[in-house]
Swiss-Prot record:
The organism's place on the tree of life at top rank: Eukaryota
Domain BAG, chain residue ranges per copy: 132-210
Protein's UniProt keywords contain Disulfide bond: no
Quaternary state and interactors: Binds to the ATPase domain of HSP70/HSC70 chaperones.
PANTHER family xref list: BAG FAMILY MOLECULAR CHAPERONE REGULATOR 2, BCL2-ASSOCIATED ATHANOGENE
Keyword annotations of the record: Chaperone, Phosphoprotein
Protein name, as recorded: BAG family molecular chaperone regulator 2
Length: 285
């Protein structure tokens, strides 16, 4: 076990030592290093008595953690009184004179409770600020991509609409306002400063781009197609003159042959002459 002496207390309770877990406790002497044994102590909390079984060489801090589960009070908000004296969490029970059936009193420490709540609030504020800075960093990365795209267009001789540049500037300034509302110390303060420097750099770069963009020549508008060029194929074909339209018009007439009614009736009234066969037929009886 690693031990480190850090001085002697003024109360005469002996020197302190550092345990492997990082807890500084009362240093044990050779004559007090007897075999540990279990004891039962009675702890009064308000009007309720709790009987706790614990090792005699445990600390008051370990006793507080056991009492926390039984009473619901946070162990950092407790004060244990033994023989009309408050006992420190780092002190051992046996070295303080605690024996089997000893009586102790547990009270809540309002000052310790307030300190703990303030510390918890500080931790929560730090986490909230860190998350807010992370969100701003994500948005700044996205806006930096737009800035890079505009820089590429203007660098190649193109021109960006002034409205797009103004919108990007407004979004960058909004992120600066959000960042200014975040407060914090340590890592939060360092991260905030880094994002502020980054945003200021992008704002300056955008100002230069706006000046450069204003000097770019105006892009020629696309030519408007004439109405004749927008006609469909069939409309165009209907408007083109055909080869036959250039020649004089052809007049088609019909000559009707008239027949006299008398001649027609005569032709119909003429008898039909029989046709004699050219072959000679032999008749047999």
């Amino acid at each position: 076990m690693m031990k480190m002496s850090i001085g002697t207390t003024t109360s005469g309770d002996g020197e302190m030592e550092l345990r492997p877990g990082g807890m500084v406790v009362q240093k044990r002497t050779d004559h007090s290093s007897s075999v540990p044994r279990g004891i039962r102590v009675r702890v009064k909390y308000g009007s309720v008595h709790h009987e706790i079984s614990i090792n005699s060489q445990s600390t008051f801090g370990e006793l507080k953690k056991i009492l926390s589960g039984a009473t619901g009070v946070h162990h950092q908000d407790m004060q244990i009184i033994y023989k009309d004296k408050e006992r420190d969490s780092k002190m051992f029970l046996d070295l303080s004179g605690v024996k089997d059936r000893s009586k102790l009193i547990l009270i809540e420490d309002p000052i310790s409770q307030e300190k703990r709540l303030l510390e918890l609030r500080k931790i929560a504020t730090k986490e909230k600020s860190s998350k807010a800075i992370s969100d701003i960093s994500f948005q700044v990365e996205r806006l930096a991509g737009q800035l890079s795209a505009f820089d590429t267009v203007i660098g190649k001789g193109g021109k960006v609409e002034e409205k797009n540049l103004e919108n990007l500037m407004e979004m960058l300034m909004n992120q600066l306002v959000k960042l200014d509302a975040i407060s914090g110390d340590g890592d939060v303060k360092l991260k905030k400063k880094m994002q502020e420097e980054r945003l200021h750099k992008y704002v300056e770069a955008l100002d230069l781009l706006k000046i450069k963009n204003s000097r770019q020549p105006q892009t020629k508008p696309k030519p408007q197609y004439k109405e004749r060029e927008m006609l469909t194929f069939y409309e165009e074909a209907s408007r083109k003159p055909t080869a036959s339209s250039s020649s004089p018009p052809v007049i088609i007439t019909t000559r009707w042959e008239t027949f006299d009614s008398s001649s027609a009736s005569t032709a119909t009234l003429q008898p039909v002459r029989p046709v004699h066969p050219k072959f000679k037929w032999e008749l047999f009886n």
